[in-house]
Amino acid sequence: MTRYQDDFYDAINGEWQKTAEIPADKSQTGGFIDLDEEIEELMLTTTDKWLAGQDVPEDAILANFVKYHRLVRDFDKREADGITPVLPLLKEFQELETFADFTAKLAEFELAGKPNFLPFGVSPDFMDARTNVLWASAPSTILPDTTYYAEDHPQREELLTLWKETSANLLKAYDFSDTEIEDLLEKRLKLDRRVAAVVLSNEESSEYAKLYHPYSYEDFKKFAPALPLDDFFQVVLGQVPDKVIVDEERFWQAADQFYNEEAWPLLKATLILSVVNLSTSYLTEEIRVLSG
């Protein structure tokens, strides 16, 4: 028998390890995996009981969970409805004519969880974890990292072509015409190139100590004068912040490339594609598969 001081892990797990097997559909096994599976099984059996009307708790949140789960599991209705449920949301974004139309709805979109291309978040301050602060980040790129956008990257064109083909097939399922698809994708790619030129690479993002750039709110607003940030934060946060921590400083220093009337057609196309991508897991099986 292995002594604890010789091999602590083997002393504890040695006997179990002799007979333990990794399931064919799993990449690992162990006590935490067993616990995870038990919790999953409990969730499934409990949800099935609630769906059958048994022992449903008198809790408004859980009652809504049951209603929502019933909708999600009604695959026949999802197939019959097709893209109909998402059409009002698509129409809302398609009818935004100008950048001013868009900025007038920024707070509304934020509170409703709709796309608005504003990468803000509230999380603990690096310098004082007891305090939550406003962080200003950046949108993500289509490709996995900014390094993929280098002209000599071997996978650049291959991956962008694959993205374009996949996106085109998906948009066809949403009844966009070929002309509309080409226009949307061209504009989306153009905005993506702008983003890729200024956001941090994965390597840069891993250097956490270098991500802390505190700005007074008044100084931060100067990065994007076209955005009604006072009104936005007053509605979303209930107050105007006194400072902003910027981890994506290059993006915000170039914010004029993204938040203005000139960039609006590119931004609008990006928002429409965001609506499509957000809805794929809630509609038909064909759309779910097309989305990858």
Regions found by a protein language model. Give the residues of each.
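Extracellular/periplasmic catalytic domains that process cell-envelope and extracellular macromolecules
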Residues: 1-4, 126-128
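Noncatalytic, helix-rich "gating/capping" subdomain that lines the substrate-entry/channel surface
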Residues: 48-292
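Active-site-surrounding "flap" and adjacent substrate/cofactor-binding loops of secreted or lumenal enzymes
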Residues: 2-7, 11-77
